[in-house]
Amino acid sequence: MSSLNSVLPSNACAEIIEGKDKVHNVVILMHGLGDSHKSFANMAKNVPLPNTSYISLRGPYRLPLDFENPGGNWMWGEDVHFDQNGELQSEADFSKSFTMISNLIGNLLSYGILSSRIFFFGFGQGAMVALYSCYKLSTKYQLGGIFSFGGTLPLSITLPNHPFHVPVYLFEKRLHCSCSEYEESRLRKTFKPFHLTCWNRDDKTDMPSSPREWYTFVQSISKHLYIHNTLFEDAIPLTSF
């Protein structure tokens, strides 16, 4: 297989962290509102997974605010909205982001990656776009799963009659601090199986902030990864061990 650089759509800006071994799994990283792909790329280098490559995407729109981020300030939606408290809202028009992700998925399939081995790891608005994209693509593909750190479904979407079979893992620093009970119920009606993990802390963000919390993520995604055993020719599930 050639380099994964060939799968990037022409309008995508991303950093690829390729696995050392043959790639069977791809994790698409999607940063939060006002961040960039650089921070998630650095994170991926510290969380290597067997037979897995990361693609850290950058949001297609520049945020018209300066947070002095070395990688710039980017967002996934075309417009910016503020709530009644003056806080930035995550929900926006994600049409351009969805087209980019849809093209990326198609290119990964052409590259030889199975749809069930394509995963999303997103924070905040990035997680919302990941959930939105999987909602729209699940009638066409069987995707591997979504790891959402504080991200919820856009309220504008109509829930399906039956949940899509896409594993969703939602992580929060404290129960319902980022995802209300109503938003959780919408996720449960849209995807299954659904798993909720609460870090039970008030500081920092919904992202993992300790080795124990990172282990929880690795343990969760490992249930769905495929690794290649050098003693055999076939790829086997990590859960077979």
UniProtKB/Swiss-Prot annotation:
InterPro entries xrefs: AB_hydrolase_fold, LYPA1-2/EST-like, PLipase/COase/thioEstase
Keywords: Hydrolase
A molecular function GO annotation: carboxylic ester hydrolase activity
Enzyme class: hydrolase
Any one GO cellular component localisation term in the record: nucleus
UniProt xrefs under Pfam families: Abhydrolase_2
Entry protein name: Uncharacterized hydrolase C9G1.08c
Protein source organism: Schizosaccharomyces pombe (strain 972 / ATCC 24843) (Fission yeast)
